[in-house]
């Protein structure tokens, strides 16, 4: 059962840009209430969709370089990468079904059926 991978600025290139499947990056912080709401949703999606998408988490308090480069000013922010390029940016918390629907717009293999 896949879980979101905690990454650092140093891991960003190898885990996100060079990944062999789409990657959803969750920019978060431990003190952020909406981030704590999104966390379990991302864990479910990571487990249910592990063949289709990789989910990683970047703590912006501990890793400010990438967040700054990508102009992440609000959290939670999620950026979807496909073939090493950002294709969607989601700011704020979202219900699981809404997030799956949004991801499926860019990742054909994402199942939006309720599980």
Which residues does each predicted region cover?
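Conserved helix-turn-beta segment immediately C-terminal to the redox Cys motif
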Residues: 21-22, 39-58
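Non-catalytic, surface beta->alpha helical segment in thiol-disulfide oxidoreductase systems
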Residues: 74, 80-112
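Structural microenvironment flanking redox-active thiols in thiol-disulfide oxidoreductases
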Residues: 60-67
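A short beta-strand-turn-helix
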Residues: 4-22, 64
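N-terminal targeting signals for export/organelle localization
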Residues: 1-4, 108-115
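Conserved Rossmann-like nucleotide-binding pocket used by diverse enzymes
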Residues: 3, 8, 28, 54-56
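Conserved redox-active cysteine motifs that mediate thiol-disulfide chemistry
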Residues: 27-41
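Short pre-active-site segment immediately N-terminal to redox-active cysteine/selenocysteine motifs
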Residues: 20-21, 27-31, 74
